[in-house]
Amino acid sequence: ADVHYCAAHYYDPARALYPDFNPFWEFVAGPLNAGSFGPNTLDNTFGPQVVFQKAPQAPNTSPLAGLQFFGEMRVDPRSRDLTVAFVDINGATVFERTLDAQGR
């Protein structure tokens, strides 16, 4: 996705217009060095829930405003759990979520 903010979305079949799927997560982050702007309205087909979002109040916000993000993912070698984190331009973690490994 071409995004200029960061967000964690959970897609839930119980809330979806089209419910024939397993629930899933979407993590988006950006940009690395460009103007920032917020999200568009989410399509309700897959029942999205915005669990976390950090975006500027105005479009085309300068990178100097500090709203630049990237994501990090770590897999625990023992449990195989996946941890996803959003990090800002200053190196601060602004969001973190651990997902349990499936099928173990």
Which residues fall in each region the model found?
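Long, structured stretches of catalytic cores involved in phosphate-ester chemistry, encompassing
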Residues: 1-104
